[in-house]
Swiss-Prot record:
Its cofactor is Zn(2+). Belongs to the queuine tRNA-ribosyltransferase family. GO terms for biological process: queuosine biosynthetic process; tRNA wobble guanine modification; tRNA-guanine transglycosylation. This is Queuine tRNA-ribosyltransferase. InterPro entries: ArchSynthase1/Queuine_TRR, TGT, TGT-like_sf, tRNA_ribo_trans-like. The active site is at D90, D277. Binds 1 zinc ion per subunit. It catalyses: 7-aminomethyl-7-carbaguanine + guanosine(34) in tRNA = 7-aminomethyl-7-carbaguanosine(34) in tRNA + guanine. Substrate binds at D90, S91, G92, G93, F94, D144, Q193, G227. Residues 258-264, 282-286 are annotated as: RNA binding.
């Protein structure tokens, strides 16, 4: 089930609300990534404490480990990982795309060698829908081919991007058919592909909307923009984003997949995006790269060795409320697990608080002023 309400707009920025089978999600929102069913270093209770409303799970990896029998025994991913709020699962398409020479793509689906033990495996739109049904995720993503930015050492041609996009369109129809056959009570999202070519993005969106219309407007609960943040220059990413996002159906949520930096999130919301996911806040946290209102901090640098201040004096997270930069520097230097946990709490809190500030700014029709203040603060640098 998915109900989406567009509450207000400010320019292209949208303030909305999604009602899903496991709860309500206020948008725009950032979704922490839990690849193997867990957001790295975070318990479900800690995620709730910092304001997480929905998390992301990885269909491909959960299918391989722990496997579907384990999921069935727990009645899905919620029962397995103890998270009782909404979950979005990707389709597995991007992970298969990432295998490179280890996989073979045909019209039927993708044959590949398991990265765990080398077993020959096959994933198709139908199998992806069946896996996601057993995971019982609130938002199911269609199976797609993620059009690469580069093929070999050169950018993908328009013909190559077109062939990939049209395959994804055919797979979208098959995903929709299987989702319906499974009587899945959750929401299915479509994915707009087309590489760096605006005309192909338009063709992809038109094809997906035709599938949606054939189902009486109930074909897809939302629309995602895929195939960005895959190695392309930032200006190309922004060009495609700013072309596609305003053209997505206004009455359904818009999801920008796999993006990105705090600046990317603000630019995405300004273009009309409602949902984001990225491993950046958690991965960077483990590497000691921390986001603050006033720029980024590399906590391992010697300048922080004796610094008694918190990471960000304006931040209300557990880490900033209790620990100094010097302590976090020490934990990072000695490789203490607690350091990764405290860093992750802070980075995710920063991302989720940034989204909350944008929701408030849109509600008060002050988003342009928020953008200017955000850019000025981040440019100042963490002193």
């Amino acid at each position: 089930m998915l109900k989406y309400e567009l509450l207000t707009t400010d320019g292209l920025a949208r303030r909305g609300r999604m009602t899903l089978n496991h709860g309500v999600v206020e948008t725009p929102i950032f979704m922490p990534v839990g690849t193997y069913g867990a957001v790295k270093a975070m318990s479900p209770a800690e995620l709730k404490d910092i304001g997480a409303q929905i998390i992301l799970g990885n269909t491909f990896h959960l299918w391989l480990r722990p496997g579907l029998e384990v999921m069935d025994a727990h009645k899905g991913l919620h029962g397995f990982n103890g998270w009782d709020k909404p979950i979005l699962t990707d389709s597995g398409g991007f992970q298969v795309f990432s295998l490179g020479d280890l996989r073979k793509i045909t019209e039927d689906g993708v044959t590949f060698a398991s990265p765990i033990n080398g077993d020959k495996l096959f994933l198709s739109p139908e199998i992806s829908m069946q896996i996601q049904r057993r995971l019982n995720s609130d938002i199911v993503m269609q199976f797609d081919e993620c059009t690469p930015y580069k093929i070999g050492d050169r950018p993908a041609t328009e013909a190559e991007a077109a062939a990939s996009m049209r395959m994804s369109l055919r797979w979208a129809q098959r995903s929709r058919n299987e989702f319906e056959r499974e009587k899945n009570p959750n929401a299915l999202f479509a994915i707009v592909q087309g590489g760096m070519f605006e005309n192909l993005r338009d063709e992809s969106l038109a094809g997906l909307q035709a599938i949606d219309a054939d189902a009486g407007g109930e074909g897809f609960g939302g629309y995602a923009i895929g195939g960005l943040s895959v190695g392309e220059p930032k200006e190309d990413m922004m060009r495609v984003l700013q072309h596609v996002a305003p053209r997505l159906p206004a009455d359904k949520p818009h999801y920008l997949m796999g993006v990105g930096t705090p600046e990317d999130l603000v630019a995405g919301v300004a273009a009309g995006v409602d949902m984001f996911d990225c491993v950046m806040p958690t991965r960077n946290a483990r590497n000691g790269w921390l986001f603050t209102r006033f720029g980024d901090i590399k906590i391992k640098n010697a300048v922080h060795r004796n610094d008694p201040r918190p990471l960000d004096e304006t931040c209300g997270c557990y880490t900033c409320s209790n620990f100094s930069r010097a302590y976090l520097h020490h934990l990072q230097r000695v490789g203490e697990i607690l350091g990764a946990r405290l860093n992750t709490i802070h980075n995710l809190y920063y991302y989720l608080e940034l989204m909350a500030e944008m929701r408030t700014a849109i509600e008060s029709h002050g988003f342009a002023a928020f953008q200017a203040r955000f850019a000025a603060d981040r440019a100042r640098g963490a002193l």
